[in-house]
Structures are given as structure tokens and as C-alpha cells.
Swiss-Prot record:
The keyword Ribonucleoprotein does not apply. It comes from the Eukaryota. Keywords: Carboxypeptidase, Disulfide bond, Glycoprotein, Hydrolase, Protease, Secreted, Signal. Disulfide bonds join 88-331, 252-266, 290-297. The keyword Glycosyltransferase does not apply. GO terms for biological process: proteolysis. SUPFAM superfamilies: alpha/beta-Hydrolases. This is Serine carboxypeptidase-like 2. Probable carboxypeptidase. Pfam families: Peptidase_S10. It comes from Arabidopsis thaliana (Mouse-ear cress). Residues 1-29 form the signal peptide.
Length: 441
């Protein structure tokens, strides 16, 4: 009887040890992915997925997709891509903005949605890491209960730690020129991350990261400047009348977001403004506003991606830890998070002083973070202009406008573009390739 009992205990212990071993395997794990469900044949590029553990106990497991440059990975730049939100998966960048695959827009019939190759991938000339951050975003997860909420400034530190550990495991990329890139909300996190890496290069970390600069699209930069630019933008785009705009300017005095409750006139006119614009798609004012994910609607691709990323065969191919998350969501809108950077302008200043290049671009039909606000904060930095406002061209057609400043900052608009480059990926790719190769736009 005793032998049976000890045998049973031994089996249980062995099973427990096996489970511990399996869970440990996924700490700082990396897998080469040669096939992806939904894509026909082997992938025409090199994809690696994995987790990097962050923190003393590595309780935070940040998930990434790494794609090698299709040109010369030994020497080409290495780009870290952060999607905004906070809480939006980096799959948004990979499948909609600048990756080598995208969703095939077939009507969903209950089978696995298909993937197809793109022509506009930034991986044609750069290696790219698409990172799910903060913890809880995409496939990133925590092995213990989180007591400290992620924050803008905290993420800059975590991302720096991620990079040090990632490069420690991929030392062949440690000397490649390195850039941080992202759009939307990451306009607050990217400049802080650049400063954190720069500081680390001087203070703590060997070998240093070969940081060269950063890229930002329609970036949230300063809450007050960006939000107050929406009404002038709406007026310039003929969404509100001259009379309403003049009344708003007169009664609100340029402050349209933190209006004093006693300023009833201003509040009344803002209500009128909202009536004029609440049926406009803020991310791209030219497109129809879709409230349901129907096949003729732009956001249908988001629904297809949700079906794809929640498929068991896809998760297996990506080597997702089965215990990590339940349902994958593209954007975790209620993610616990402390928005502690109200303006990233001081970081831009410090990064310029440190000599880093930057490309700031704006889709010029975005009402969410309008180009007017981006131009305003860049102008307030008072850098001298070395290449004044001019069109930049693709095949003898105007693709947007650009201006370059003495602090190595280039500003560009993408004509007809929206809040993210998923609306104009071909044009954005050409703009990026020229800039990253050191050519004028």
C-alpha cells in the first residue's frame, strides 16, 4: 500500500517537474517560423517569434516578431516598431502598415483567413522587431499578478531592458544601425525610449546599442497642442463653417479641451462642432464611418485578423505559450496604464542635442492627431530650416510635402494619408526607404 502511495507521489512530482520545465522553456524563448497558417507555401522571408523576460524575476514576458532584412541583414538597419494604443498589438504594424504580409480581404466563411505578400514592406531594406508592449498587449503577458501599472516612462525602461536582452541573444545585430519607430500613442513612448537608450549607452551598458535615430507617424506628442489643433484642422478641411470657427476662436481663445465650466458660450460652440464632426471617421476623414465590421468596410481586416490570431494552429505556429493569454484582441482599450508623459517635446529636444536623426510624418487627412499640431510643436522647438517646404515626389506625382531642420529632423506629410500608414503604405514605404538610406525625400 505504501509503495503504491509513494509511486503515485513520485508520478505527481515528475509531472510537476515536467510542467515546470515546459513553462521555463517559454521564458526567453525564440522560434524560427518557416510556415504560417493562411499563407501558401514557405514564408519568403526569415521570421522569428519569441518572448523576452523583463524584471528581476522575468515575470513580464514581452512577445515579439522579428523579420530579417531581405537585402543585407548583416549591415542593414535594425528597426524596433511600437504600435500605439496603449495596448494595440504590433500585429497592426506587421499586417497593416509596413510588414511583408497582410490579410487577404475575402468574405469570412468560417475557415482560416488568408495572408498574402505585400510590395511595401520596410523589411526590404531593414530588419524589424515588432514588439507587443505594454504587458497585456497582443501575446505579451505576466507570469505573476502585476502590482505596478505600466506607464509611459516605465515602458521606456522596459523596452530598453528588452533590447539589451534581445541583442544579447542576437549579437550578430549589435553593431547594426538601430532606430526606434512607431505611430499614434507611441509618440509619447518612442522619444522617451530613445533618451533611455542614449543614457544607458553612456552610463551602464556594454556593448552600447548603435542608436542612430527614430521615426514617428502622426505622433501624439503634447496633449494640449494636439487636441487643440483639431478645430483649426476641421475648419481648414471645410468640416465647420467660417462663422462657427470664428465664434470658437473668440469664446474659447484657442483652448478647446480644458474649458472652464463657466464658459458656457465656448461649450455651446464646441457642442456645435461635435455635431458637425461626430459622423466623421477621425483616423481618415475621407473614408466612410463604419460602425460594424462588414466586408465593404475598412475595419473588416481587423475582424479577419482577430479570427486568424485566435486560431489554434496559428498560435502553435507562432509558438505562443498556451497558458499566457485567453482571447487575443488587436487593441486592449482598457489596459491598466498610467499616462505619465503629458508632452514628449523635452525628449525630442534632448534627443536632438544628442545628435539623433528623426523622421516625423503626418497623414494629412487625420483628425485624431492633425498635422497642424505636429507642425506647431516642431515650430516651437525653434530649429533653423535647412531645406524649406517643398513637395516630395513619386513617379513625377506629388506624394506629400517636406521640410528639414538643422537638428537632423525631417518633417513630411503624406498626401491623402490618415492616422496610420495602413491608409497609404506604398507611399510611406518609399518615404521611409529614402530617409533610412540617407537620401532626400
Amino acid at each position: 500500500m505504501a509503495n503504491k502511495y509513494f509511486s503515485s507521489v513520485l508520478k505527481s512530482l515528475l509531472l510537476l517537474l515536467h510542467l515546470v520545465f515546459l513553462s521555463k522553456q517559454h521564458v526567453d524563448s525564440a522560434s524560427i517560423v518557416k510556415f504560417l497558417p493562411g499563407f501558401e507555401g514557405p514564408l519568403p522571408f526569415e521570421l522569428e517569434t519569441g518572448y523576452i523576460g523583463i524584471g528581476e524575476e522575468e515575470e513580464v514576458q514581452l512577445f515579439y516578431y522579428f523579420i530579417k532584412s531581405e537585402r543585407n541583414p548583416k549591415e542593414d538597419p535594425l528597426i524596433l516598431w511600437l504600435t500605439g494604443g496603449p495596448g494595440c498589438s504590433s500585429i497592426s504594424g506587421l499586417l497593416f502598415e509596413n510588414g511583408p504580409l497582410t490579410m487577404k480581404l475575402d468574405v469570412y466563411n468560417g475557415t482560416l483567413p488568408s495572408l498574402v505578400s505585400t510590395t511595401y514592406s520596410w523589411t526590404k531594406t531593414s530588419s524589424m522587431i515588432f514588439l507587443d508592449q505594454p504587458v497585456g498587449t497582443g501575446f505579451s503577458y505576466s507570469r505573476t499578478q502585476q502590482f505596478n501599472k505600466p506607464s509611459d516612462s516605465g515602458e521606456a525602461k522596459r523596452i530598453h531592458e528588452f533590447l539589451q536582452k534581445w541583442l544579447g541573444k542576437h549579437q550578430e545585430f549589435s553593431s547594426n544601425p538601430f532606430y526606434v519607430a512607431g505611430d499614434s500613442y507611441s509618440g509619447l513612448v518612442v522619444p522617451a525610449t530613445v533618451q533611455e537608450i542614449s543614457k544607458g549607452n553612456y552610463e551602464c551598458c556594454n556593448p552600447p546599442i548603435n542608436l542612430q535615430g527614430y521615426v514617428l507617424g502622426n505622433p501624439l506628442t503634447d496633449y494640449a497642442i494636439d487636441s487643440n489643433s483639431r478645430i483649426p484642422f476641421a475648419h481648414g478641411m471645410a468640416l465647420i463653417s467660417d462663422e462657427l470657427y470664428e465664434s470658437l476662436k473668440k469664446t474659447c481663445k484657442g483652448e478647446y479641451t480644458n474649458v472652464h465650466p463657466r464658459n458656457t458660450q465656448c461649450l455651446k460652440f464646441i457642442e456645435e462642432f461635435n455635431k458637425c464632426t461626430n459622423r466623421i471617421l477621425q483616423q481618415l476623414i475621407l473614408d466612410p464611418l463604419c460602425e460594424t465590421e462588414t466586408p465593404d468596410c475598412y475595419i473588416y481586416r481587423y475582424l479577419l485578423t482577430t479570427y486568424w490570431a485566435n486560431d489554434a494552429t496559428v498560435r502553435e505556429a507562432l509558438q505562443i505559450n498556451k497558458e499566457s493569454i485567453g482571447e487575443w484582441v488587436r487593441c486592449y482599450r482598457t489596459i491598466p496604464y498610467d499616462n505619465d508623459i503629458k508632452s514628449s517635446m523635452p525628449y525630442h529636444v534632448n534627443n536632438s542635442i544628442s545628435g539623433y536623426r528623426s523622421l516625423i510624418y503626418s497623414g494629412d487627412h487625420d483628425l485624431e492627431v492633425p498635422y497642424l499640431g505636429t507642425q506647431a510643436w516642431i515650430r516651437s522647438l525653434n530649429y533653423s530650416i535647412i531645406d524649406d517646404w517643398r513637395p516630395w515626389m513619386i513617379k513625377n506625382q506629388i506624394a506629400g510635402y517636406t521640410r528639414t531642420y538643422a537638428n537632423k529632423m525631417t518633417f513630411a506629410t503624406i498626401k491623402g494619408g490618415g492616422h496610420t500608414i495602413e491608409f497609404k503604405p506604398e507611399e510611406a514605404s518609399i518615404m521611409f526607404q529614402r530617409w533610412i538610406n540617407g537620401q532626400p525625400l
